[in-house]
Amino acid sequence: MTRIKRGYIARRRRTKIRLFASSFRGAHSRLTRTITQQKIRALVSAHRDRDRKKRDFRRLWITRINAVIRERGVSYSYSRLIHDLYKRQLLLNRKILAQIAISNRNCLYMISNEIIKEVDWKESTRII
């Protein structure tokens, strides 16, 4: 067998890892073994938090919509609004509704009033 020279390959791998961890504090940016452990941990946290961010924003949007809706009508809530939106087959997602609730509350009130009128009218004309 012939001899294989791979002198700089390991060094190149370690410098690449060190560049990733250059902003870490203490031994986490200096020692190779702890750098690799912290890199794995950082990537796991980033992957987990990308999913968590979606959940957190959805929760924030729901809270904002519910707060604005409950200000106007005492008996009307977020869950009834979303249910009535689906009944009327309106394509307004929670993100858009939350933006409308923050920027222009009157517009959200008009949307909810139209939905309530439409649903009440359909229920009152239904033949049993």
UniProtKB/Swiss-Prot annotation:
UniProt keyword NAD, yes or no: no
GO molecular function: rRNA binding; structural constituent of ribosome
Encoding gene (name): rpl20
Protein name per the record: Large ribosomal subunit protein bL20c
Function: Binds directly to 23S ribosomal RNA and is necessary for the in vitro assembly process of the 50S ribosomal subunit. It is not involved in the protein synthesizing functions of that subunit.
Main location class: plastid
Keywords, alphabetical: Chloroplast, Plastid, Ribonucleoprotein, Ribosomal protein, RNA-binding, rRNA-binding
Keyword rRNA-binding in record: yes
One protein family per Pfam: Ribosomal_L20
Cross-referenced InterPro entries: Ribosomal_bL20, RIBOSOMAL_L20_CS, Ribosomal_protein_bL20_C
Subcellular location as annotated: Plastid, Chloroplast
GO BP of this protein: ribosomal large subunit assembly; translation
HAMAP family, sorted: Ribosomal_bL20
PROSITE patterns named among the record's database cross-references: RIBOSOMAL_L20
Annotated source species: Nicotiana tabacum
Gene3D superfamilies reported for this sequence: 6.10.160.10, Ribosomal protein L20 (1.10.1900.20)
Upper lineage: Eukaryota, Viridiplantae, Streptophyta, Embryophyta, Tracheophyta
Family: Belongs to the bacterial ribosomal protein bL20 family.
A Gene Ontology term for the protein's cellular component: ribonucleoprotein complex
SUPFAM superfamilies given in the database record: Ribosomal protein L20
